[in-house]
């Protein structure tokens, strides 16, 4: 076969990473496997198959066989812009089944069910590791069966085909015309089903269900997918530690704020929101169940970074389950210590032990954390001041070693990250109070001389804010600030936050992936990914269409 078109050669991101790993392992493990691809019309079966051929072409020859439309039309619709495969990889059995991209000696003039297996054997003999996709298998069977007076049924032919594939180490994809269960599922080695539906607000939800894959352990049977840009892509899991940076990874380049908007700090999200968050607005970040304890940082960290990089003040009341020192460690790795110490104010409070500090839960139901590497240790849960103590000790140590306090400056390690002597902490007895908080941020405003960002976990700040949300929203609007209110599953605080919020976003888990979507404004489902090609990992969003 001709060499792949270099313009469309699959990269790691375009191929194996975005193609389900379990399916790749299914084909690259034991040779001779046959995969049945089920799904109703419009679910993306053909695009899934083409993506698979792109992946498998890297270690062998591939052939896409159809009877639906001619070679040129198939190539124009599915291959030309989105695949490394050219027309020679496409075969229309209804036109000329012997017009092959290989030098094949076929000892018969007409292709039928009785000669199909021999035809495949001749192709295999002229190729290296071979993959053939039949799309759709039912239509190809019917076309070939029409040439016989007394043809065997499709189950018999499929059994013979699968047996040949195992014997000759041929990889097969059989695309079905239906999503319904069929006897073919018991014959083949693997079965996947593509599904599509709309939620109550009209959002498209697409999934790939891994029914069975011989020889492969399936940890997550239902995987979110998208057909964005006319290509099949699996929306892959995100490990939250990769969202954050390590020491000396790079310097955050500030994104531009406009007179009407604050940048979200996420390049893919700003255009969806017509430039970012409105000035003077309240954003509700609604966390779904079974998210790791640091999931709140996915949407908020980029905004915090961008405010600080623009030398604007930030006040953060993080969730009490959050990793100790998360903000301090992240922000000091992408911004100068002076910027963090001057403009960022983090209030760690203690509001009682959580039943499971490693995850968000709903109505008493405890879920397994997505990111077990970030789960709190038993000592964290047992210490009544675990989060505060660990963070403050780290801050105190780093300040004393790198930035000694100026004469007369007080470092209040028990209540907030850094507090000058002229600022009185709003945290008393481990609890945040509303009026002292407002007085504190007014002093911060004088120092930064501009709008402020408030990031407040409502679960942590409940006693201070639950009866004052209306007043707080008015304050934010009056001063052209930005506030992000974070709520956890199954609490009344969700409804209260919604009543004052100008925008409402929800972060939820789908399979092992993390999805973001807007309830107000209404947005599509957006899969969260990470671009690690830059010194600072960047959030990327993939629309589910």
Curated annotation (Swiss-Prot):
UniProt-annotated stretches for the region Required for interaction with GvpE: 318-362
Effect of residue 42 to A: Does not repress gas vesicle overproduction in H.volcanii
Pfam families membership: GvpD_bR2, GvpD_P-loop
Location(s), subcellular: Cytoplasm
Highest taxon above the source species: Archaea
Keyword set, alphabetical order: ATP-binding, Cytoplasm, Nucleotide-binding
Subunit structure: Interacts with GvpE, also with c-GvpE from H.salinarum.
Biased composition (Polar residues): 370-380
Region (Basic region 1) location: 201-209
Protein task: Causes a decrease in the amount of GvpE protein; tested in transgenic H.volcanii. Plays a role in repression of excess gas vesicle formation. In transformed H.volcanii, an internal deletion in this protein leads to very high gas vesicle production and overproduction of gvpA mRNA; complementation with wild-type GvpD under its own promoter yields normal gas vesicle production and gvpA transcripts. Overexpression under a strong promoter prevents gas vesicle formation and causes large decreases in gvpA transcripts. Expression of a 9.5 kb mc-vac DNA fragment containing 2 divergently transcribed regions (gvpD-gvpE-gvpF-gvpG-gvpH-gvpI-gvpJ-gvpK-gvpL-gvpM and gvpA-gvpC-gvpN-gvpO) allows H.volcanii to produce gas vesicles.
Region of interest (Disordered), ranges: 352-418
Keyword Transmembrane: no
Gene Ontology terms for molecular function: ATP binding
Listed name of the protein: Protein GvpD
Listed result of changing residue 44 to A: Does not repress gas vesicle overproduction in H.volcanii
GO cellular component assignments: cytoplasm
Organism of this sequence: Haloferax mediterranei (strain ATCC 33500 / DSM 1411 / JCM 8866 / NBRC 14739 / NCIMB 2177 / R-4)
